[in-house]
Amino acid sequence: FEFLLQGPENVEFSDHFKKLCKNPIVVHRIPKLRPNIKLALKEWDKFFRNNAHRYDILWSNQNGLTHLEFLKLAKKYGIKKRIVHGHCATADKFYRFIHPLNRLFVGKYATDFWACGVEAANHFYHGKERKNALVINNAIEVEQFLYNEEVREKLRKEYDISEDCLVVGQVSRLYEKAKNQSFCVKVFSELIKKELNSRLVFIGKGDTTFLKNLAKEYGVEDKVIFTGLKSNVGEMLNILDVFFFPSNFEGLPIVLVEAQANGLPVVTANHLPVARILENYDNSLSLKDEFSIWADKILSVRNSRILDREKVYRKITESGYEIKSSTRELERLFNE
């Protein structure tokens, strides 16, 4: 594998990922399409012209069909297998125009059509491409996420959280446009009225300024914890009692699989793709419902964590999200 990334932003590969790679990780940088489209396309063409002969497969992982240039260039310079892999089931305002337009032409340049879930497949493809689309589950190493009481106790001491405290939270980058974390703060401000001994925990990196100011505005700033980026996400989940995920849009969120692998009750919104594996997964509410109703829902599931690790492991595996079996299937598809 080699990685082709747009823009100069740093990308952090976990130590675990680096160990899995037999060879050093190779990252190629090309400019973003905007603001200078002409320059970007010139550099993109140069990259594919000079490197396409080394590649058997182009695997284009996308949140939307914002452009088809990678696929066009891969076809132009002779890469035989060209995979589009869709990871989102909705588009923001700008891409609501360009995405459906590119859907009409994606079949001209791609050879394989993948998606992380049925909803994402329906969003990315239509006609023949949708009929031929494959759903590729975002699989995980289940053992890393199974509930661990000792780790829970250790982390709660580290963050000065009592054992009887209700801890609600999520794992995600702090990105308001998609993740809707302001909604979490507003619901939590209602929750705290009903259960004073509560905390809201955000596990992930990003600019905290907006959310901290919002928490202060709602009078809960001393009850909200930002852990920053953590490499031990599987362990961090143990600190929670409820996984709260009211995103504006997603594909099929891998974090919902990870949360269920920890046995956590999940409370998410009813417009998102369904990722139900365990019975304590709840997506009955709408983002239009009152914050107090969401708070009541969280309280109703607070004690429903599934502690039977063997049951959880079996359920995740049977649902097709266990990494070893998924890896074998991916290898088969790459070699077709």
Where are these regions (language model features)?
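A conserved mid-protein helix/loop that constitutes part of the nucleotide-sugar donor-binding site
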Residues: 166, 170-190, 200, 209
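N-terminal strand-loop element at the rim of the active site
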Residues: 1-39, 206-208, 333
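Carbohydrate-associated surface elements
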Residues: 119, 139
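Nucleotide-activated donor-binding/catalytic signature segment of Leloir-type glycosyltransferases, i.e.
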Residues: 212-228
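A charged, aromatic-enriched C-terminal amphipathic alpha-helix characteristic of glycosyltransferases
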Residues: 144, 306-336
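Aromatic "clamp/platform" in nucleotide-sugar-dependent glycosyltransferases that forms part
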Residues: 229, 248
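Short hydrophobic beta-strand element within catalytic cores of glycosyltransferases
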Residues: 4-5, 265-269
